[in-house]
């Protein structure tokens, strides 16, 4: 069984009164233990595909299955994004902001999958600046341990086992002193 499966994935962005389709009908599967690379020229949709696989961005259409869970099963993706009536001001300009509103059940499903199955390394530096390396690694584990629906094996670790695991990870990537 594939750990990641995309089927007929699409993503469109509004551009004025037009719509730009950044991803058009992408389908592929990644099996457990398989190495995959997404390549292409700038603007070809690579980051958009990764953001959808990482459950950071919603597809406009299609399906994503992660470790057997159909992420958007039972959800009409075209209804998920709505206009928000809040206004934000920056530099005196008032602009309407869009935000994605997800049904509570889907939000829980996505959060659970992110915590138990996904890891994401961004191009930009996205650590929590007030935390050290150890604490940045520990933080998602603390969140996960509070989630009753979590299925991570780390949930069963004792405090000392978690400390050992975090130190192992730090050493593995060469960040020890």
Language-model features: where?
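Short coil-to-helix segment of the ABC ATPase nucleotide-binding domain corresponding to the Q-loop/switch region
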Residues: 131-140, 147-148
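A short, flexible loop at the N-terminus of ABC-type nucleotide-binding domains that lies
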Residues: 2-3, 12-25, 75-76, 87, ...
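The feature captures the beta-strand-to-loop junction immediately N-terminal to the Walker
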Residues: 39-41
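Short beta-strand immediately N-terminal to the Walker A/P-loop
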Residues: 36-37, 120
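Conserved ABC ATPase "signature" region
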Residues: 69-73, 145, 150-177
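Conserved ABC transporter NBD signature motif
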Residues: 62-100, 150-154
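Helix-to-loop junction immediately C-terminal to a conserved catalytic motif
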Residues: 54
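Conserved beta-strand
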Residues: 6-9, 21-31, 62
């Amino acid at each position: 069984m594939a750990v990641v499966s995309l089927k007929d994935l699409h993503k469109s962005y509004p551009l004025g009164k037009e719509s730009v389709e950044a991803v058009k009908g992408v389908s592929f599967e990644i099996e457990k233990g398989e190495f995959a690379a997404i390549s292409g020229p700038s603007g070809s949709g690579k980051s958009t595909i990764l953001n959808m696989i990482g459950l950071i961005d919603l597809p406009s259409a299609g399906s994503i299955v992660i470790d057997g869970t159909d992420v958007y099963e039972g959800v009409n993706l075209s209804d998920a994004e709505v206009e928000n009536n809040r206004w934000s001001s920056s530099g005196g300009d008032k602009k309407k902001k869009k935000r994605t509103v997800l049904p509570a059940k889907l939000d829980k499903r996505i959060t659970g999958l992110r915590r138990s199955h996904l890891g994401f390394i961004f191009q930009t530096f996205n650590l929590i600046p007030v935390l050290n390396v150890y604490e940045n690694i520990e933080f998602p584990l603390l969140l996960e341990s509070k989630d009753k629906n979590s299925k991570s094996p780390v949930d069963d670790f004792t405090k000392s086992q978690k400390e050992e695991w975090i130190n192992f990870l730090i050493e593995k990537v060469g960040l020890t002193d």
